[in-house]
Amino acid sequence: MAATDLERFSNAEAEPRSLSLGGHVGFDSLPDQLVSKSVTQGFSFNILCVGETGIGKSTLMNTLFNTTFETEEASHHESCVRLRPQTYDLQESNVQLKLTIVDAVGFGDQINKDESYRPIVDYIDAQFENYLQEELKIRRSLFDYHDTRIHVCLYFITPTGHSLKSLDLVTMKKLDSKVNIIPIIAKADTISKSELHKFKIKIMGELVSNGVQIYQFPTDDEAVAEINAVMNAHLPFAVVGSTEEVKVGNKLVRARQYPWGVVQVENENHCDFVKLREMLIRVNMEDLREQTHSRHYELYRRCKLEEMGFQDSDGDSQPFSLQETYEAKRKEFLSELQRKEEEMRQMFVNKVKETELELKEKERELHEKFEHLKRVHQEEKRKVEEKRRELEEETSAFNRRKAAVEALQSQALHATSQQPLRKDKDKKK
């Protein structure tokens, strides 16, 4: 019965009916309500800056938002890449923006650059994981949650004029499925316009040939489709950053002063800074936020939930409930636990057998060694006994010879002492 009701409700939901209203209801104010709620809540926008030390990341951020962010000066002697986030509260008119700028400090400064991308990937995944954990809470509060997911990665390319470095290709390839990448050529005033044009073509060709997916400004919205299509053709943007003001004619402009002339930051004939600012902030900021949530975060979330045992149902079957998923995961866990216990028990038994064999082998070796030492001891004892007997025999022979010699000496002494007495007797006669 329950299954029939569920099918009936499902069919009803699949076939909505169109009705006409007899008068004004009021839900046409929903867009205004949404705008009012969004303005009250405020917005968050998180930018990841990746590029070599000294390439102008901090200067460009100051120029983009027309302010001065307090940042520590980075050293060229970092032992590893570390991510340094800084959060600022900005306000323009009545719109609040919580801006987080994450700098990849030390990127490209190490001799071994094979794993330079790893801390960046780990940081992006960590922000996804934090958001996922907040979503999975029983009592979650996403309204007040400070979303730290990276919305855009500005990848600063060194203006060599030749081609992309292998480090750039590897890093962007590792990041393109996790974040919206906008490649920019930094310090574009250091190479000529002709070299810059060739460099842009070379960069885009290398990105395409290596399968690197960069962020494309959306063309499905009629309001911005035309300008976005034009701007897509200008990628990568060649930018110049500066917070210094230089007098050009009768007005002050942000520019870089050189002995040979002035490079105006906001002059589109000099660089693409205005194009970058328009595309990044004025036109596509919300799309970058949406792409981060609906594409990159959803990919991470799907992979994580599949690892946890969740999965979508087939078209012909009923969706899996949380209880079914839990029970299936519990059975899988218990089965895995039993298998591990059996493996450990078998390993323990094998280890005991191996130990017993080793002990028996040691015992046999010790017994053989003991028997060998015993034989050696007996042999030595026999030799000592023979030596003792020989010594006793020699001692006895020596004593006999000594006694014989003493007897002979005594007889000789006695005979010698009798001769004077005989002479005295003869004289008396």
Swiss-Prot record:
Gene3D superfamilies noted in UniProt: P-loop containing nucleotide triphosphate hydrolases (3.40.50.300)
Region (Disordered): 376-397, 409-429
Compartments reported by the entry: Cytoplasm; Cytoplasm, Cytoskeleton; Synapse; Cell projection, Axon
Basic and acidic residues compositional bias, start-end: 376-391
Sequence segments annotated as region (G3 motif): 103-106
CDD domains: CDC_Septin (cd01850)
GO biological process: regulation of intracellular protein transport; regulation of protein stability; regulation of SNARE complex assembly
Residue pairs linked by disulfide bridges in the UniProt entry: none
MF annotations from Gene Ontology: GTP binding
Role according to the record: Filament-forming cytoskeletal GTPase. May play a role in platelet secretion. Seems to participate in the process of SNARE complex formation in synaptic vesicles.
Protein name per its UniProtKB record: Septin-8
Gene: SEPTIN8
